[in-house]
């Protein structure tokens, strides 16, 4: 599994909590889907495109969510999980 940095863990929790306000089942499914994508990164760490920030890569984990990650010693480190509508990198 990729290494989840604290900011990415917080992002993931915030996303699922937001979804759970309206639909707890959908929140659980989103959390599961995000973790399923983690298995892909574990096997193929270079899967995502070159990131907008030097040294990062980006993977569309869901049409609404993008993972920002880096690869260190062939291990993917998930740095952030951003909604596709959010500005990244921050201005």
Where in this protein do the model-derived segments appear?
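Short hydrophobic/aromatic beta-strand or adjacent loop that forms the aromatic wall/cage
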Residues: 56, 64-66
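Enriched for short, Lys/Arg-rich terminal
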Residues: 66, 70-91
């Amino acid at each position: 599994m990729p290494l989840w940095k604290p900011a990415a863990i917080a992002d993931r929790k915030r996303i699922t909590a937001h979804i759970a306000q309206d639909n707890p089942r959908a929140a659980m499914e989103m959390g599961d889907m995000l973790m399923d994508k983690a298995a892909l990164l574990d096997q193929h760490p270079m899967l995502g495109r070159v990131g907008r920030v030097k040294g990062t890569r980006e993977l569309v984990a869901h049409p609404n969510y993008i993972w920002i990650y880096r690869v260190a010693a062939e291990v993917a480190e998930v740095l952030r999980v951003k909604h596709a509508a959010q500005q990244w990198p921050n201005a």
